[in-house]
Amino acid sequence: MTALTVPKKDTTALKQPSKQAEAILQAKDINIYYGENHAVKQLSLDINKNEILALIGPSGCGKSTFLRSINRMNDLIPSARVTGTLAYEGLNLLSDDVNVVALRKEIGMVFQKANPFPKSIYENLVHGLRFHNVKKKEWADIVEDSLKRAALWDEVKDRLHESALSLSGGQQQRLCIARTLALKPEVILLDEPASALDPIATAKVEELMVELKKNYTVVVVTHNMQQASRVSDRTAFFYNGELIEVNKTDVLFRNPEKKQTEDYISGRFG
């Protein structure tokens, strides 16, 4: 994991008890501020290897803000400030000596709105490879493998040099997922990846998420509780910047422990 740290600076390892070895990410006492706005409050949460964790809650509850903190996307917002620790394989990802470029390769993100580059399908996939100095002779295999993992290869293999903007919305979103996979991440962050898609495209993205779990850890923000119940292993409910409850998805939806959770999933507020 030395690639995640800036050379010639020390990083203090965060030793974790063996009983927590299944957790690939461990957030502890995370507070996130935008100026004076306390957006996420004292959050602690383990994210387990090869699981799909869904983050649910009403708009403005802090779920996307927390998601963006995992690979330091909040660094791009001048007023943002994050405190606490976010441990990933022994490193505190919030430390100043973390190489953020390497981090975003290791922990990739796919956004709500598909954002393919205005280039060919092929160039979308090799853009990151070129940036990270991956040998050119490896590109073709990586492109094919990534598109297959994103369940898109059969649909585009004969048009790789056509514009990515010619793809349908669902195909564009799967291309963005393939673009992330090309960099061989360990964790994939999905911020409402299907909210702008039709039901058929949504179903394909959901099927893809379940398939990805075999090789990756997936954290997905969704307003769609049915989607969370279909694809996730565990669900975390956020409200007013706080993590209210986290549990196995079927347990949380059938028998929530907190009244706020029950009120939200039953539609009493949202």
Curated annotation (Swiss-Prot):
Gene3D superfamilies: P-loop containing nucleotide triphosphate hydrolases. Keywords: ATP-binding, Cell membrane, Membrane, Nucleotide-binding, Phosphate transport, Translocase, Transport. One of its GO terms (biological process) is phosphate ion transmembrane transport. This is Phosphate import ATP-binding protein PstB 2. Its EC number is 7.3.2.1. The complex is composed of two ATP-binding proteins (PstB), two transmembrane proteins (PstC and PstA) and a solute-binding protein (PstS). Residues 25-265 form the ABC transporter domain. It comes from Shouchella clausii (strain KSM-K16).
